[in-house]
Amino acid sequence: MFAGRKLVIATMHQKEAVIAPPIENILGVDCFVAKNFNTDQFGTFSGEIERKLSPLDTARLKCYTAMKVTACDLAIASEGSFGPHPSMFFVPADDELLVLIDKKNELEIVVREISTNTNFSSKEVSSKGELIEFAEQAKFPSHGLIMKSGGLSNQQILKGIQDWELLVNTFDQQIQLYDSITIETDMRAHCNPTRMEVIQKAVAKLIEKINIVCPTCGTPGFGISDRREGLPCSSCGFPTRSTLAHISTCQKCGHTREEVYPHGKTNEDPMYCDNCNP
């Protein structure tokens, strides 16, 4: 289905470094990056351009736009989001979506990788000591920083700082004009090796999912599409909100398969039961 075809990677931040090698090796495709393709048009981490769509729809739009400008019918794009972990609210997380779209075969395969392995952070600093402390905690200079100064109407943003001399000199200049400076981690992939590692894990997940084919029609990407609650409480037997089954669906033929007790648990702790612990 994929072997011998061209595949465009929708990126301007060097994600092809971790996407292309395994994808080419496993799928037998020829990966390339669209020239002068500006993914900042879909939103920036530094805030100048707001992301207007959901992360998934943004990744889809990247794919379709890259396919349009390159006349290619196979694309991959990723979209990252940074903030509190969905279940560990006080822990920052990198939430990466990776999407493969095959227009020729009308196929879309999506994977998600959520990781607490991130240096995502920002701080308002007013002294060189605070600046250096933040930079060291953020793994600078191997990981880039962003410096913001000025108000909303005249804000100056310097991205991709990965040199101590540039960081300190820029701070010295700006702190003479403003009481404080906002310093942030640069989360763009080419400035953040830790994020690249998370994207690499998402690529491994994507390949794993592609290799799972529908048992009926053989279409790649046969994976979990839904979950069914109702794992019984070990004390009272009442159905809990925990997962009882995973449901996998084929995009092509619609074949479904239900896997009961997907986590190897046949019952749930009473602390998660609305009957025992309302």
Predicted regions and their residues:
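N-terminal glycine-rich phosphate/adenylate-binding segment common to multiple enzyme folds
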Residues: 62, 67-102
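N-terminal beta-loop-helix "entrance" segment that forms/cooperates
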Residues: 37-58
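N-terminal beta1-alpha1 ligand-phosphate binding loop
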Residues: 2-23
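Compact, glycine/acidic-enriched structural inserts
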Residues: 107-144
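Active-site rim beta-loop-alpha module in soluble metabolic enzymes
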Residues: 135-203, 208-213
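N-terminal segment of the mature soluble domain
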Residues: 20-41
